[in-house]
């Protein structure tokens, strides 16, 4: 029980719920939990590129590795993601998708314990190379780094982020998810609750500083090209024939 959590959200009777938990889990005994340690990954100092081939449509994806949830800057990452892409008025939405410079594009973040990730992806237009689509994505990162975005975009991104969080909080499943995530990431629940207020105070200069600090030539690019996949084949094993006694009854 010292390495698990029972997450409940909804219209519950606290006293009855506690009784049920004690009845079903009360005899669990504490055990020593070994502390997990890991070797930090080597720093990426130049772009790493790889190509995969398959029959599906072509795309390009760019990934950055960022600090984990305990880092003092990580709370800004979801806001950076929303500034770039929020389905309506992010830099990628306005400059690439609505201007039809690529067929489609997006960006998203994933905050985890040891490291977080940030990823941008695009599907090229007909006649457009994956390298051209890649450069268009990177150009939007550069706009963050130079502060080349309208002043209204940051307050709008903050309001949009808070609105989405409020709407999702109407559902028990989302509230349970937030508590589960906080438990897994070892976050103080008070910090999770105050995250929106903290995010509301982020300035444009903080966005610029964040982008310059973490978005350098330290990314990985995957080019998905159209073609016949040349995947290694597993040799088919010899199958032993099984004699069936169809006329035998037991």
PLM regions: where:
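Active/ligand-binding-proximal structured segments within catalytic/core domains
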Residues: 62, 72-84, 92-94
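M16 family metallopeptidases and their MPP-like homologs
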Residues: 3-9, 58-68, 94-200, 220-225
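Short, solvent-exposed loop/turn segments at the edges of secondary structure
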Residues: 1-2, 43-46, 54-59, 74-75, ...
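Short amphipathic alpha-helical signal-transduction/dimerization elements
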Residues: 25, 84-88, 138-145
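Secretory-pathway/luminal and periplasmic proteins that interact with or process carbohydrate-rich
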Residues: 27-34, 89, 163-171
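Proteolytic maturation boundary segments
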Residues: 5, 13-53, 59, 94, ...
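Solvent-exposed, non-transmembrane alpha-helical starts
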Residues: 19, 70-74, 129-134, 232-233
């Amino acid at each position: 029980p010292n390495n698990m959590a029972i997450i409940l959200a909804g219209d519950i009777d606290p006293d009855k719920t506690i009784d049920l938990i004690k009845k079903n889990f009360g005899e669990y005994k504490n055990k020593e939990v070994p502390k997990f340690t890991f070797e930090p990954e080597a720093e990426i100092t130049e772009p790493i590129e790889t190509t995969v081939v398959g029959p599906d449509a072509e795309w390009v994806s760019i990934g950055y590795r960022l600090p984990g949830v305990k880092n003092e800057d990580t709370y800004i990452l979801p806001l950076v993601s929303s500034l770039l892409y929020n389905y309506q008025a992010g830099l990628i939405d306005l400059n690439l998708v609505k201007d039809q410079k690529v067929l489609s594009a997006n960006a998203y973040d994933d905050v985890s314990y040891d490291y977080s990730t940030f990823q941008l992806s695009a599907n090229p237009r007909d006649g457009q190379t994956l390298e051209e689509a890649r450069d268009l994505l990177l150009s939007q990162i550069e706009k963050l780094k130079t502060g080349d975005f309208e002043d209204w975009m940051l307050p709008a991104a903050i309001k949009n982020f808070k609105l989405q969080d409020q709407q999702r909080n109407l559902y028990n499943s989302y509230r349970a998810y937030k508590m589960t995530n906080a438990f897994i990431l070892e976050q103080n629940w008070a910090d999770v609750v105050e995250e929106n207020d903290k995010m509301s105070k982020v300035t444009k200069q903080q966005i610029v500083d964040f982008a310059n600090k973490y978005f350098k030539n330290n990314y990985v690019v995957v080019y998905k090209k159209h073609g016949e996949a040349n995947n290694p084949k597993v040799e088919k094993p010899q199958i032993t024939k099984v004699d069936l006694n169809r006329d035998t009854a037991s």
